[in-house]
């Protein structure tokens, strides 16, 4: 497997990202909606929006969406989709301070991104900064247990047949929880979700992970 810089990896993945059999994405989409709740009329930030799969859904539901990603190729795919004109897209490196106003969002989402973030403390502080006092920060990430299976974000490049992995970081669950604590974010919900028969019926790749935790979800609220 070829490990490449994270941005370069997602630039290469963008063209076919939405077409790949990705059981983690399917599992996440099953659970993130109920956790998000009704977003009608809310200001929503999608940090690490990729090809816009969530941003478009929330915009269609009536949210005012700002979507941020560092991959121009991913953003190009997102902007080309139906409904994208209603979304404000921002290209920005997530390792740096986000160019968004403080306390401007009712929901701050960060979906399947954290394993590519080296410095969690400063990143969690940024997520909290964006969130309104009575808002929520909602995070999804590949469950750390997947590392025991030797799994990390990866794809097979159709043109070359090579297995490519954008560079990632092996964080533990405690790393995420303690980063939230240090950012003064309170844990309202934590969910661990495993592959099941329903997922395997939709995604052949999920079959080898039946019963194994694949997804971690956190719902956080600013302290005080």
What is each model feature region?
Residues 98-107:
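A short acidic, Gly/Pro-enriched loop at the edge of an enzyme's catalytic core
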Residues 45-96:
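Class I SAM-dependent methyltransferase SAM/SAH-binding core
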Residues 168-191:
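Short alpha-helix
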Residues 107-119:
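A short SAM/SAH-binding and catalytic strip from SAM-dependent methyltransferases
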Residues 186-224:
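Conserved Class I S-adenosyl-L-methionine
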Residues 1-39, 53, 57, 74-77, 136-163, 167, ...:
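Conserved class I S-adenosyl-L-methionine
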Residues 121-136:
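A short glycine-rich, Lys/Arg-flanked "PGG" loop and its adjoining helix->strand segment in the class I
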């Amino acid at each position: 497997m070829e490990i490449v810089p994270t941005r370069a990896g997602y630039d290469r993945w963008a063209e076919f990202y939405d077409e790949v059999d990705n059981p983690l994405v399917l599992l996440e989409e099953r659970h993130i909606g109920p956790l998000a709740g009704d977003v009608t009329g809310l200001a929503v930030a999608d940090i690490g929006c990729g090809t816009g799969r969530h941003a478009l859904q929330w915009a269609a539901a009536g949210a005012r969406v700002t979507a941020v990603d560092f991959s121009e190729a991913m953003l190009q795919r997102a902007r080309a989709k139906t409904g994208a004109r209603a979304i404000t897209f921002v290209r920005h490196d997530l390792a740096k301070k986000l160019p968004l106003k403080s306390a401007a969002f009712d929901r701050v989402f960060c979906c399947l991104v954290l394993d590519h973030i080296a410095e969690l403390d400063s990143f969690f502080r940024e997520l909290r900064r964006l969130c309104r006092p009575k808002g929520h920060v909602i995070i999804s990430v590949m469950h750390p247990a997947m590392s025991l299976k030797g799994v990390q974000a990866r794809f097979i490049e159709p043109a070359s047949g090579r297995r490519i992995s954008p560079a990632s970081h092996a964080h533990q669950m405690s790393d995420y929880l303690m980063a939230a604590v240090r950012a003064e974010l309170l844990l309202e919900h934590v969910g661990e979700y495993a592959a099941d028969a329903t997922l395997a019926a939709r995604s052949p790749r999920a079959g080898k992970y039946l019963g194994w935790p694949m997804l971690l979800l956190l719902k956080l609220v600013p302290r005080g």
